[in-house]
Amino acid sequence: VSAAALIDEAARVRLAAGVMLRHDRRRGQWMLMAPERLLVLDDMALAVLRACTGAEDDVGGAIDRLAAEYDAPRGEIAADVLALLNDLRNKGYVAA
């Protein structure tokens, strides 16, 4: 993956084509479903995805909201959010 393809704070993130965010009521779990694969999300991954993919602003704005919501240092939130989003992009679950 080239450095130019990395998701940064200026990016606008969306679920990749064919990927759906679904809740399994029986198991009480949220997951990303894609053709022939799925990824179960923990609470933090779900919060990040909701903040970044449902927002009208960029990833930086989502980081600001998450840092305020969780009363955490912005730098730590930014590092975690960008690492997660780039991992999900590498696996084909999100795009920018």
Model features per residue range: what roles?
Residues 1-50:
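Acidic, low-complexity/disordered tracts enriched in E/D and polar residues
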Residues 37-96:
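Long, charge-rich, low-complexity alpha-helical segments
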